């Protein structure tokens, strides 16, 4: 009998989603499985989407972010009696297999990179508060700053939601109040928005403000200058999730005791043109400039 895998998504980032779907489809095809894709959101709840997948005869479900952290999704999967693999959760729920990177270490590595360029006035745009990866990335930023003997004040952290629009609002606030020499955004969408706001204010990236992101989606090489970011191997994480779910399904069919497995993928710090050495004295001088003036 051909294995059927369900994938349910509600990620607002088109760049992230396209890579994830591509990896899932490729591995499903290689494994001879049928991939059934469902979107939730709007009028349909996560529970309803998962119930429809279960009624359609899927043998297991993949839950990428943000659904991997949703109690509604996890409860629906458990009630349906389906094995699930959580992808990109910063703190995977007990009893479920997962694929992720070490968000804490990745964020700390990026913070260290900015510090190594001489930046001290580093601002941070956090991700959606309901996603556990956001908390891990924020912790990594705090740890990196603490290692350098620097405290983090509330005015150098802005709340985002992993969307371009939230990045615009967060960057506007940070540039107007904290005057950073570098901004580290929790994903590439918000980093791209930060660059747009910076340019609009007549500031140069990276001459006046360095900007860094997270994920290394195709957007990172579409913006100008190209974005320094953390590469999260999104497509490979999706492929690994399919492989892991197939193992779980086959184990159940063979009545083998299923093991909870958490597979960590490697992240990479990708240094491009949006970050540079801080200008002399810039760490102590507010970054302001009227648009159109040099």
Can you name each region flagged by the protein language model?
Residues 30-31, 80, 146-152, 175-179, ...:
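Short helix-capping segments at alpha-helix termini
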Residues 28, 144-145, 198, 249:
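Conserved hydrophobic residues forming the short capping helix/wall of the S-adenosyl-L-methionine
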Residues 73-81, 143, 194-203:
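Glycosyltransferases and closely related glycan-assembly transferases
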Residues 9-19, 37-45, 67, 98-109, ...:
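Hinge/beta->alpha junction and helix N-cap segments in small-molecule ligand-binding domains
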Residues 172-293:
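Flexible loop/turn connectors
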Residues 2-112, 116, 174-175:
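Alpha-helical recognition/docking segments in bacterial nutrient-uptake
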Residues 120-121, 152-156, 205-210:
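Short acidic capping loops at alpha-helix termini that bridge into adjacent secondary structure
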Residues 59, 120-121, 180-181:
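Short acidic/polar active-site loop segments enriched in Thr and Asp
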